[in-house]
Amino acid sequence: MAGLNSLEAVKRKIQALQQQADEAEDRAQGLQRELDGERERREKAEGDVAALNRRIQLVEEELDRAQERLATALQKLEEAEKAADESERGMKVIENRAMKDEEKMEIQEMQLKEAKHIAEEADRKYEEVARKLVILEGELERAEERAEVSELKCGDLEEELKNVTNNLKSLEAASEKYSEKEDKYEEEIKLLSDKLKEAETRAEFAERTVAKLEKTIDDLEEKLAQAKEENVGLHQTLDQTLNELNCI
């Protein structure tokens, strides 16, 4: 009778151990599923981080291109400013030439007045100064020719001054155009910089999330190892109990 009771006790112990082993196995499977899920989430987070890094790289490349366009625009603006300075210096040279021509014309007018005065004197003294009158008439003719040449030169100078003024206006318009482009490029660079900062912030958040997921996975792996050790212990106890039962 005592042997039967002992056998029943052993069977109950075996059943209890078997139940514990099944429960441990279920827990191990649940932990494994949870671990797999965490690994999938970690892989997804790593994919998000890689995508963000690619976006950051694209934004940086676009920013570099915008900076290159801005540098080109600034260089063209500088060249336009130099051309405007050269045109201004050319205008000053033309103004100086015009002033000199005006001075020459004033001198010629004075000479003309003097020639007329001499001609009047010659009329009164025709017989006496006939030879001088011929000379003065020749000088008057040459003076008139010089006056005509000066008038033609003044016309040419006025046309040249008009062309320089038009060129200067064109340069000013080009300078305003480049200034507008520069403002546009600066605004584009600011938008790209804001996007880059936003992408970097999202990348940092994703990296922190990955770190948390990795810690969770490590904890789950540790729990899984403990559960496996418990399962091995239960199996050893079960084997020992079966051996004892066989000995009986």
Curated annotation (Swiss-Prot):
The modification Phosphothreonine is found at T216. Gene3D superfamilies: 1.20.5.170, 1.20.5.370. The modification N-acetylalanine is found at A2. Keywords: Acetylation, Actin-binding, Calcium, Coiled coil, Cytoplasm, Cytoskeleton, Disease variant, Metal-binding, Muscle protein, Phosphoprotein. GO terms for biological process: actin filament organization; muscle contraction; osteoblast differentiation; platelet formation. Residues 2-248 form a coiled coil. The keyword Calcium applies. It is found in: Cytoplasm, Cytoskeleton. SUPFAM superfamilies: Tropomyosin (SSF57997). The keyword Flavoprotein does not apply. It comes from the Eukaryota. One of its GO terms (molecular function) is calcium ion binding. InterPro entries: Tropomyosin, XRCC4-like_C. Detected in cardiac tissue and platelets, the form found in cardiac tissue is a higher molecular weight than the form found in platelets. Expressed at higher levels in the platelets of hypertensive patients with cardiac hypertrophy than in the platelets of hypertensive patients without cardiac hypertrophy (at protein level). Residues 33-47 have a biased composition (Basic and acidic residues). Residues 15-47 are annotated as: Disordered. GO terms for cellular component: actin filament; cortical cytoskeleton; cytoskeleton; cytosol; extracellular exosome; focal adhesion; membrane; muscle thin filament tropomyosin. The modification Phosphoserine is found at S6. The modification N6-acetyllysine is found at K177, K215. The molecule is in a coiled coil structure that is formed by 2 polypeptide chains. The sequence exhibits a prominent seven-residues periodicity. PANTHER family: TROPOMYOSIN. Belongs to the tropomyosin family. Homodimer. Heterodimer of an alpha (TPM1, TPM3 or TPM4) and a beta (TPM2) chain. Binds to actin filaments in muscle and non-muscle cells. Plays a central role, in association with the troponin complex, in the calcium dependent regulation of vertebrate striated muscle contraction. Smooth muscle contraction is regulated by interaction with caldesmon. In non-muscle cells is implicated in stabilizing cytoskeleton actin filaments. Binds calcium. Plays a role in platelet biogenesis. It is linked to Bleeding disorder, platelet-type, 25: An autosomal dominant disorder characterized by increased bleeding tendency due to decreased or dysfunctional platelets. Platelet morphologic and functional defects are variable. Some individuals have normal numbers of enlarged platelets. This is Tropomyosin alpha-4 chain. The lineage of its organism: Eukaryota, Metazoa, Chordata, Craniata, Vertebrata.
